[in-house]
Amino acid sequence: MAEQQDARVYSDRRHEMVEQLKRYGITNSKVLEAFNAVERHLFFDAAYRDFAYDDGAFSIGYGQTISQPYTVAYMTSMLVERCPSGKVLEIGTGSGYQAAILEYMGYSVYTVERIEALFRRSSLILGALGLTVHQILGDGTLGWEEEAPYSGIIVTAGAPEPPSALLGQLAEEGVLIIPIGDSTGQRMTVFTRRGEMFQREEFHTFAFVPLIGREGWREE
């Protein structure tokens, strides 16, 4: 009985979250459907699940966060508008929530995580949910070359510049969505591949954890 009551509460909270996303300007029906379907609280430790549907980032340990729902929805909307289907690479698996959203939307999802504890935790969660997300432990700034090219690449951490390895792994007309900037804030930036050239578009400012790796920031 308690589990059924909790399920209803979480379902109501998800609905409230989706309504808030609409008020914030998220209008894509596929994105909203995914956010209403994927149970965000399952990506939180049990002690913190009451915070899962709040509109804020939340620590998942190791200096990393699960991004606030609006940020995830914003990046997902940018992807689906430019790349409605295909093979997508996520840099920074973190909790696994973004990968689950992409999988629900029908993408073939590949994701890279550099922190072993988060890699193992997200693998367990995604596996328990029966999702066929392809995961690897490694330096996300180098992408996943063996599985390239990708129709889209989403980076869930802030970088000083777009890693050349990621640009090189885009398919023709593929898009790289990445926050670019410094520790004070990053502009959400989209790079679209046109042959050996990349069209650059800049959008709103966000605050992400740093992208650590050979082509990102150094670990302090």
Swiss-Prot record:
<feature type="active site">
    <location>
        <position position="67"/>
    </location>
</feature>
<dbReference type="InterPro" id="IPR029063">
    <property type="entry name" value="SAM-dependent_MTases_sf"/>
</dbReference>
<dbReference type="GO" id="GO:0032259">
    <property type="term" value="P:methylation"/>
</dbReference>
<keyword id="KW-0963">Cytoplasm</keyword>
<keyword id="KW-0808">Transferase</keyword>
<dbReference type="InterPro" id="IPR000682">
    <property type="entry name" value="PCMT"/>
</dbReference>
<dbReference type="Pfam" id="PF01135">
    <property type="entry name" value="PCMT"/>
</dbReference>
<keyword id="KW-0949">S-adenosyl-L-methionine</keyword>
<comment type="similarity">
    <text>Belongs to the methyltransferase superfamily. L-isoaspartyl/D-aspartyl protein methyltransferase family.</text>
</comment>
<protein>
    <recommendedName>
        <fullName>Protein-L-isoaspartate O-methyltransferase</fullName>
        <ecNumber>2.1.1.77</ecNumber>
    </recommendedName>
</protein>
<dbReference type="GO" id="GO:0036211">
    <property type="term" value="P:protein modification process"/>
</dbReference>
<dbReference type="GO" id="GO:0005737">
    <property type="term" value="C:cytoplasm"/>
</dbReference>
<comment type="function">
    <text>Catalyzes the methyl esterification of L-isoaspartyl residues in peptides and proteins that result from spontaneous decomposition of normal L-aspartyl and L-asparaginyl residues. It plays a role in the repair and/or degradation of damaged proteins.</text>
</comment>
<dbReference type="GO" id="GO:0030091">
    <property type="term" value="P:protein repair"/>
</dbReference>
<keyword id="KW-0489">Methyltransferase</keyword>
<dbReference type="GO" id="GO:0004719">
    <property type="term" value="F:protein-L-isoaspartate (D-aspartate) O-methyltransferase activity"/>
</dbReference>
